[in-house]
């Protein structure tokens, strides 16, 4: 949520961007509600109650990654969520990855999300193979389909490049 306008932004469910979703839901449900970014909730829960707490109990600085139809992230510093001035702290999915990449709904081109999200990888596979497949099916064919292999190699290569920028900036204890 934009901290000033209270409107949703940077959602890969683009029809929700620009909406006062918290206010809308509160009015529809006639209840007070709270809304948070999924990546922030995930990384906070893992840090305080989940696998980070279990395996690295003294950890204070964590970067959590959400990947699916979109690409997002959450930052924990000193065991607190970092929202940033505009409420988009951790949103590495909108960091530049390819200068000549596809347009992103955020208004930029070549964002991480336009390269390694599930949707982006399915689009890439279709472009090089002419076939439309879901990412799980592409992955299942990676050993006997050269286009599927190339798609998964693209994911691995660009995931590493994108994440290396986060690591160099944040230097988290755990990802």
What positions do the PLM features span?
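ATP-binding/phosphotransfer module of carbohydrate and carboxylate kinases, centering on a glycine-rich
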Residues: 2-5, 23-31, 48-60, 81, ...
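Structural signature of FAD isoalloxazine-binding scaffolds in flavoprotein oxidoreductases
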Residues: 88-91
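Glycine/small-residue-rich loop that forms an oxyanion/phosphate-binding "nest" at active or ligand-binding sites
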Residues: 34, 40, 44-46, 55-60, ...
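Short beta-strand scaffold segments in enzyme catalytic cores
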Residues: 72-76, 95
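N-terminal glycine/serine-rich phosphate-binding loop of ATP-dependent small-molecule kinases
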Residues: 1-41
